[in-house]
Amino acid sequence: MAGLMSCSQKPEQMIMTVNGPVPASQVGITLTHEHVLVDFIGADSAGYHRWEKQEVVKKVLPYLAEIQEYKVTTLVECTPAYLGRDPWILKELSSETGMHLITNTGYYGAHNNLFIPEHFSNMSAREISEIWVDEFENGIEESGVKPGFIKIGVDGHDTLSKEHVKIITAAALTHQQTGLVIASHTGPDRPAFEQISVLQSHDVDPSCFIWVHAQRGSLEGNIRAANMGVWISLDNVNLNIEEGSEYDVRWYADRINELKNAGYLNKVLISHDAGWYKPEEADGGTFRGFSGIFTALIPALEQKGLSTEEIHLLLEVNPRNAFFLRN
């Protein structure tokens, strides 16, 4: 579309990690939607006082070590501010493991705005974007850590509310200033295309948008969005889902194969939406690991005939093409 910001990758593009920018070509095998810690208490009570950092690090390290056995080098941590984002923990985990971790800026409006801070209601989209841009330019609080993407969320059961239009507008304005890709907790087709429309109205190309939880959308919707350039994030690979049920591993293999057959494998991102340390539970509660893609989904895709090159596309090429800085 004429006038839209170009988001085609160029040589030596960079990706912002918790330790600073790295060449996109060096990020390697990447899990694009995971969580280290999530705190569902709500924005009015959220804060670092809710957890002990070293306990979180101790809990999470073995799960990162496990995926390093599968040569995973990068993990995109999708927990937003006011939901348990902790850049200090992510930086320490990166230091302990040598992995690239990527955090985010943005606000999460899903669940009826429970995780949006009080100041949001009295601020314009431009003013909200200035907060997010400041995190990118100067770091998150005093951590020195800069976000590598914009993470927002909208409710998927209805048309976008005015609050959620403000969130996606703020994301568009932030993208224009920073070049960060926008990943939005979305789900079904309708909110996905409504958000794409808002982005286009602000001259943001659809290829700068990740449709998070796109498995909740229709195949037709996934194909239509991919044709526009949108990234299709199939991101809840979960071995705890009973075989034969919707969204089991076979379902994911089928959806990925269908997108391949439609010509859009190069727009697919895969992950687990797994983890995570829960501050309200003893020892952080039950932690779901990050290895199911390697133990179950990749073998299922290989059975469907996906080649080594196509697996490489899903695990390495697509993530770096999605998360590079567009500036």
Q: Where does each model-flagged region fall?
A:
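Mid-to-C-terminal alpha-helical segments outside catalytic/metal-binding sites
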Residues: L4, P11-G20, S291-N327
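Alpha-helical scaffold segments that flank or form the walls of functional sites
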Residues: G28-T32, L37, S45-H100, R126-V145
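Divalent metal-coordination and catalytic microenvironments
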Residues: H33, L75, H175, I232, ...
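Acidic/histidine-rich helix-loop elements
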Residues: V36-E55, L114-S121, D158, I241-G244, ...
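Active-site gating/metal-coordination segments in enzymes
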Residues: E92-S95, H100-I102, G106-T178, W231, ...
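Catalytic pocket-lining loop regions of alpha/beta-barrel enzymes
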Residues: Q176-K260, V268
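Short acidic/histidine-rich active-site segments
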Residues: A183, D235, Y264-F287
